[in-house]
Amino acid sequence: MRIADYSVTKAVLDRHGFTFKKSFGQNFLTDTNILQKIVDTAEIDQNVNVIEIGPGIGALTEFLAENAAEVMAFEIDDRLVPILADTLRDFDNVQVVNQDILKADLQTQIKQFKNPDLPIKVVANLPYYITTPILMHLIESKIPFQEFVVMMQREVADRISAEPNTKAYGSLSIAVQYYMTAKVAFIVPRTVFVPAPNVDSAILKMVRRDQPLIEIKDEDFFFRVSRLSFVHRRKTLWNNLTSHFGKSEDIKTKLEKGLALADIKPSIRGEALSIQDFGKLADALKEVGL
């Protein structure tokens, strides 16, 4: 019997008197086929260390520990630590870290792996309410995570993996795809969780690029320009730019010069621009003094 089998999950929760906290976005997966599929998608083997976020009672952790060299699982809810010690007692390659992943010193933590030189993959069922902050925190860290295979709200997965000229495409798509490739691997129905969430989930596979997708002069400015271009999705790029930078004649002149330099029409909408287009735009606006 697996931890994820419904009868086992229920027995574990009952034995420990565990109640779910909405503030932690807790939904436990009870489908072993999906858990195996996650491990297969992540291509976990003995030559890989894994960081897991939000292990819950250890359903996914069990599958990871059977395949990986070592698993480091970050759990913010201290009520789950003794439960994990119980459910994962047969594994000597699992470290449970009772800490918020956003506050963890990951550079120090990964040195605690028995073999810290192995490639590191992130595999997790992320809480819906904090998916984006966790992802961006990990992506922007200086730790060379090889890839992420993470479960999240389907809508967020669609936004991250979206292409230009689609409804889902936006600044989040750009922020992630600048660093990583992103593809939805498969959909997970809401019915396989306890308690069941209100929406379906998706498994998103993200692989780190050897180099960022494009070369730009100022990354912070690039991300700022991409974000402001989607503040009002139905407005033109020109309207979003002037709303942010200002509408004085001097600013308008600089914006006109920058757009011309990047060969981008002011009447276009942000959703029509590729990441490469945003790179050219940011560099051009920087060049004209914005």
From Swiss-Prot:
Write down the PROSITE patterns for this protein, in alphabetical order: RRNA_A_DIMETH, SAM_RNA_A_N6_MT
Q: What broad class describes the main subcellular location of this protein? A: cytoplasm
Q: What is its EC number?
A: 2.1.1.182
The subcellular localization recorded is: Cytoplasm
For this UniProt record, the keywords arranged alphabetically read as follows: Cytoplasm, Methyltransferase, RNA-binding, rRNA processing, S-adenosyl-L-methionine, Transferase
Q: Which domain of life is it from?
A: Bacteria
- GO MF term (any one): 16S rRNA (adenine(1518)-N(6)/adenine(1519)-N(6))-dimethyltransferase activity
- InterPro entries attached to this UniProt entry: KsgA/Erm, rRNA_Ade_diMease-like_C, rRNA_Ade_Mease_Trfase_CS, rRNA_Ade_methylase_Trfase_N, rRNA_adenine_dimethylase, SAM-dependent_MTases_sf
Residues reported to bind S-adenosyl-L-methionine: N27, L29, G54, E75, D100, N125
What catalytic activity does the UniProt entry give for this protein?
adenosine(1518)/adenosine(1519) in 16S rRNA + 4 S-adenosyl-L-methionine = N(6)-dimethyladenosine(1518)/N(6)-dimethyladenosine(1519) in 16S rRNA + 4 S-adenosyl-L-homocysteine + 4 H(+)
Q: Which SUPFAM superfamilies match?
A: S-adenosyl-L-methionine-dependent methyltransferases (SSF53335)
Q: Per the record, GO CC terms?
A: cytosol
One Pfam match, given by its short name, reads RrnaAD
Query: What's this chain's function?
Result: Specifically dimethylates two adjacent adenosines (A1518 and A1519) in the loop of a conserved hairpin near the 3'-end of 16S rRNA in the 30S particle. May play a critical role in biogenesis of 30S subunits.
As for family, the record states: Belongs to the class I-like SAM-binding methyltransferase superfamily. rRNA adenine N(6)-methyltransferase family. RsmA subfamily.
* Protein name (record): Ribosomal RNA small subunit methyltransferase A
Per the UniProt record, the source organism is Streptococcus pyogenes serotype M5 (strain Manfredo)
